[in-house]
A protein has these predicted regions:
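ABC ATPase NBD coupling module
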Residues: 1-18, 48-55
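Conserved ABC ATPase signature
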Residues: 78-82, 86
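Q-loop/switch helix immediately C-terminal to the Walker
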Residues: 30-44
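H-loop/switch region of ABC-family ATPase nucleotide-binding domains
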Residues: 139-140
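ABC ATPase nucleotide-binding domains
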Residues: 171, 178-209
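Catalytic Walker B motif of ABC-type/P-loop ATPase nucleotide-binding domains
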Residues: 103-106
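Conserved ABC ATPase "signature" region
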Residues: 49-74
Length: 209
């Protein structure tokens, strides 16, 4: 019950959790370095946070996070000069820069081509594994999910359909889950939540609306 927590406990919870939305909240005139370093805000005090808006610290952290997504050449670019896919990757770099132990990612591949999507998933998994964190992502790509994540949870209308290792998710199960949307099984399906394997907890949710 987060709403019952005191300010100190609430700050601690915020430090442990990071949400990367499908469309990251990036003010148009903001520099990429500032956008990425926003991932460190839960670990900063108020004065340090305000100072960082003018004189960014930890530039090396931002540069390394951007390099995970081939964006290190955009470090001082304005975000409104980036493409949609680049802005989405800046949002993911912000997650990489954070120190959170629970990483929640909403449709991180929606604006990316297949190779960028594969690279992004590998970077997210690498981050979670190195940190011992839990990575949960919402995807629309069944093939990517099965290839990159250890555990899949299928939901239909908010109810559990299956909760299995990815290796046990068969075409028959997917056909049952998406009985009215079989054309999407070739690559796209309604929101799929996944979690990183290895050191991270492995969760995945495949809701069928």
């Amino acid at each position: 019950r987060p709403w019952e927590l005191g300010s100190r406990a609430l700050q601690g919870m915020r430090r442990r959790l990071f949400l990367a939305p499908q469309v990251p909240p990036l003010p148009p005139r903001q520099r990429v370095v500032t956008a990425v370093l926003a991932g460190l805000l839960p670990d900063m005090g108020l004065w340090h946070s305000l100072k960082s808006l003018v004189y960014p610290n930890h530039i090396g952290v931002a540069d390394a996070a951007l390099a995970e997504f081939d964006l290190d050449d955009k470090l001082f670019e304005r975000v409104d000069r980036l493409s949609g896919g680049e802005r989405q990757r800046v949002g993911l770099a912000r997650l990489v820069a954070s120190s959170a132990a629970l990483l929640l990612v909403d449709e991180p591949l929606s604006a990316l081509d297949p190779e960028r999507a594969r690279q992004a998933l590998l970077s997210l998994r690498h981050t979670a594994q190195n940190r011992g964190a839990t990575l949960v992502a919402t995807l629309h790509h069944v093939d990517m999910a099965l290839a990159h994540f250890a555990r899949i949870v299928g939901l239909r209308d908010g109810e559990l359909v299956f909760d299995l290792p990815a290796s046990q998710v068969t075409p028959a199960l997917l056909q049952g889950l998406y009985a009215s949307r079989l054309d999407e099984l070739a690559g796209l399906a309604p929101a799929i939540d996944f979690a990183s394997p290895a050191n991270a907890h492995a969760h995945a949710t495949m809701p069928c609306r």
